[in-house]
């Protein structure tokens, strides 16, 4: 019986030692496989493939890399950090591989012209901080007075550029009081080129309440033969 007892004792001691050795290795393996991908952010979103590159709809992070570099929604990105971009998967993959804090060249097309900008990537935490800082600013959000769902990206008559045609203008709101009309095509908001409806919405939200902004518009006449007017309309913003 003593030999059986000794054998069992040796077996259990060995099993415990093996478990103690293997458990940390398994835990370490789980840690490795669960490590999240560290991705760089540049403050833009919602990419669309084009025949020349990748267009994005809006600068989504006020004060972020793309915003500081002067990019706006509607720009078509041709290359990122020297790498040609042909579809949205490529730029997403490149942002995953680009180190946080790296300064890169971004080649893009706006209004048919090729341009280059430099921007420095940021972390997800910094991107969230900037977004949160904007959303919680004490001044609040501005109000323009239009149905954003009715606005659409259109070609500006007689040009190779795009603007945003406004739909419903709400009565007795800032846009209406300033003389903005349904069908007006917005080409700039306080000097910022407007090429997509999403970018226009972001710029409206970013304006300070009760500030006066300059709206650049193109207005078509009632008849097809009427000349196209280019107007600069000052709009005193409201507050949401």
Predicted feature locations:
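Residue-level signal for short segments within beta-strands and strand-turn junctions
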Residues: 108-110, 123, 217-219
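Extracytoplasmic
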Residues: 37-41, 51-54, 61, 72-73, ...
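PDZ/PDZ-like peptide-tail recognition elements
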Residues: 21-57, 120-164, 168, 206, ...
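Short, solvent-exposed loop/turn segments at the edges of extracellular beta-sandwich modules
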Residues: 221-223
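PDZ domains, with a preference for the canonical peptide-binding region formed by the helix
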Residues: 79-107, 188-216
